[in-house]
């Protein structure tokens, strides 16, 4: 999978160390259930099959007990509620990258820059691994989901509660002073992440979740870049601007001259 989208039958037979007729029988059944797909070039694991492999690995490790409802479908994956073997509720995120995401990834993500002839499933695995590693470095200092386990293209994270800022009208339940306080709390988390060594790189109202108690969590970190990245200033200033842009509709910037991209950039990086 790392080197092919389609694996030739003879290679599968060689790896399986089984008679060809037995391999074909099993491949036919896997294809029937949608776990593999077939073409004139060979066979490939389907996204559903890759999901099943990751789920099976979590179950065999004694981590996962049950999968619940789908919470949503994001730009880069599907998210489900899950029940862990220790009784905790958590979140299961499957990274799923098509050709468009991969093209974007090769252009912007350093950890994919030297990967050329690899499958889309392997790209999904790399991004999941990358996000898990970053969350491990940020949690619990930064308000991010707790990383629990990773396998293939899937990550199990601590339960996340809240709504995207995009879906909320903060003025309905917060005063202007509380809204301004929330803005600066988000900036503080951006600063903490920077001090650890990372810039989110795609921060916006779509990946900041706010709960009913006014607490928040920042999600979606696979595209994060190190603070020593050649384009670090561009990404950090873009993140800052995206947060300012969202809060501008509440006019908090009119009363606080510190709410400025360059001033906040200097504050974060000093």
UniProtKB/Swiss-Prot annotation:
Record: residues binding ATP: 72-77, 93, 158-164, 206-207, 220
Its EC number(s): 2.7.11.1
Ranges for domain Protein kinase: 65-270
UniProt GO cellular component terms: cytosol; preribosome, small subunit precursor
Entry annotation: catalytic residues: 202 (proton acceptor)
Matching SMART domains: RIO
Cofactor: Mg(2+)
GO terms, molecular function: ATP binding; metal ion binding; protein kinase activity; protein serine kinase activity; protein serine/threonine kinase activity
Gene3D superfamilies registered for this protein in UniProt: Phosphorylase Kinase, domain 1, Transferase(Phosphotransferase) domain 1, Winged helix-like DNA-binding domain superfamily/Winged helix DNA-binding domain
Keywords: ATP-binding, Kinase, Magnesium, Metal-binding, Nucleotide-binding, Serine/threonine-protein kinase, Transferase
Superkingdom in the source lineage: Archaea
Biological-process GO terms, alphabetical: maturation of SSU-rRNA
Binding annotation for Mg(2+) 1: 76, 220
Reactions catalysed according to its record: L-seryl-[protein] + ATP = O-phospho-L-seryl-[protein] + ADP + H(+); L-threonyl-[protein] + ATP = O-phospho-L-threonyl-[protein] + ADP + H(+)
Keyword Iron: no
Binding-site list for Mg(2+) 2: 207, 220
InterPro entries: Kinase-like_dom_sf (IPR011009), Prot_kinase_dom (IPR000719), Rio2 (IPR030484), RIO2_wHTH_N (IPR015285), RIO_dom (IPR018934), RIO_kinase (IPR000687), RIO_kinase_CS (IPR018935), WH-like_DNA-bd_sf (IPR036388)
Family: Belongs to the protein kinase superfamily. RIO-type Ser/Thr kinase family.
Self-association state and partner proteins as the record states: Monomer.
Record's protein name: RIO-type serine/threonine-protein kinase Rio2
Species for this entry: Methanocaldococcus jannaschii (strain ATCC 43067 / DSM 2661 / JAL-1 / JCM 10045 / NBRC 100440)
């Amino acid at each position: 999978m790392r080197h092919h989208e389609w694996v030739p039958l003879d290679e599968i037979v060689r790896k399986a160390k089984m008679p060809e007729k037995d391999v074909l029988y099993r491949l036919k059944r896997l294809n029937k259930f949608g776990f593999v797909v077939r073409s004139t070039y060979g066979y490939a694991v389907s996204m559903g099959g890759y999901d099943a492999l990751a789920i099976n690995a979590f179950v065999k490790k004694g981590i996962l007990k049950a999968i619940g409802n789908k919470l949503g479908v994001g730009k880069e994956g599907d998210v489900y509620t899950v029940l862990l073997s220790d009784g905790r509720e958590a979140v299961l995120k499957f990274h799923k990258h098509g050709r468009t995401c991969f093209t974007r990834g090769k252009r912007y993500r350093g950890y994919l820059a030297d990967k050329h002839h690899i499958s889309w499933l392997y790209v999904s695995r790399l991004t999941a691994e990358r996000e898990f590693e970053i969350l491990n470095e940020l949690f619990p200092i930064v308000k991010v989901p707790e990383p629990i386990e990773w396998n293939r293209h899937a990550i199990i994270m601590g339960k996340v509660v809240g709504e995207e800022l995009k879906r909320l009208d903060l003025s309905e339940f917060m005063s202007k002073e509380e809204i301004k306080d929330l803005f600066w709390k988000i900036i503080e988390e951006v600063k903490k992440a920077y001090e650890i060594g990372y810039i989110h790189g795609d921060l916006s109202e779509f990946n900041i979740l706010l709960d009913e108690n006014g607490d928040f969590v920042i999600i979606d970190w696979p595209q994060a870049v190190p603070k020593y990245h050649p384009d670090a200033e561009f990404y950090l200033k873009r993140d800052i601007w995206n947060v300012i842009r969202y809060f501008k509709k509440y006019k908090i910037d009119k009363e606080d001259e510190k709410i400025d991209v360059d001033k906040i950039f200097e504050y974060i990086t000093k």
